[in-house]
Amino acid sequence: MYLELVKKNSVILDKDGNKVKEVELPFIFSFPVRKDIIRRVFLAEFTHSLQPKGRDPMAGKRTSAESFGINLGMARVPRVKNSGEAALAPNTVGGRLTFPPSVDKKLVEEANDKEKQLAVISALSATADKVFVKARGHVFKDSVSFPIVVTDDIVSLKTASEVEEFLEKIGVYDDVKRVKERIRIRAGKGKMRGRKYKESIGPLIIVHDSNSPIVKAARNIAGVDVVNAKDVSVIHLAPGTHSGRLTIYTETSIKILDERLSKRLVS
């Protein structure tokens, strides 16, 4: 059984949001969206960044505590010599953990290389579908067509205000406003650990050059990420396993993605 794909067309916009021309998109934007593969590969890539952790084997055990025995009218928990203070047992203050974290725990999920490639293709295809982008919660003007492809000169934008103006002109700045309004303080101890605020996911800009000025210009805009087409993965395209991120492509980045992934569809 063969999968028959039909190529889509897309309009290319300039910095000011004006239509420049229409181009035919590669097959990677016509692939069926496989949520199951996207989820599997996202979890595989996400868990590869996790660090094993354990506990000191002697934690909670550095004490002289022993049980005084039975028939003394008191609990049989271990007690410190010359003190009588309960220690060592899991139900005591400063006692050991019953089941401490182990470095032997298997944290990393696995996925095949072919699955990883298909997941990226599938996630790219979701970014070209207005239904998926809307369902993910992104906000944009009704006139916006997907996928959003722009001319290569947008990579020369040097300031955050220029990038914001560009996003306004192509009709997706409302999504940045949505992210700004939803920045909130995290519940729990994460506040003490350098991650005080929670921020939603906003637009993704895929470029063809990692050293272009827009990479630094956009990094302080709420929710916006800039990624090289050579490095883009399911982590960027489907954060939290949810496909359909609002994505903006440069014209050359489309060609790079086609060279990188189209062989997977042929084979």
Swiss-Prot record:
One of its GO terms (biological process) is translation. InterPro entries: Ribosomal_uL4, Ribosomal_uL4_dom_sf, Ribosomal_uL4_euk/arc_CS, Ribosomal_uL4_euk/arch, Ribosomall_uL4-arc. The keyword rRNA-binding applies. GO terms for molecular function: rRNA binding; structural constituent of ribosome. Keywords: Ribonucleoprotein, Ribosomal protein, RNA-binding, rRNA-binding. One of its GO terms (cellular component) is ribonucleoprotein complex. PANTHER family: 60S RIBOSOMAL PROTEIN L4. One of the primary rRNA binding proteins, this protein initially binds near the 5'-end of the 23S rRNA. It is important during the early stages of 50S assembly. It makes multiple contacts with different domains of the 23S rRNA in the assembled 50S subunit and ribosome. Belongs to the universal ribosomal protein uL4 family. Part of the 50S ribosomal subunit. This is Large ribosomal subunit protein uL4. It comes from Saccharolobus islandicus (strain L.S.2.15 / Lassen #1) (Sulfolobus islandicus). The gene is rpl4.
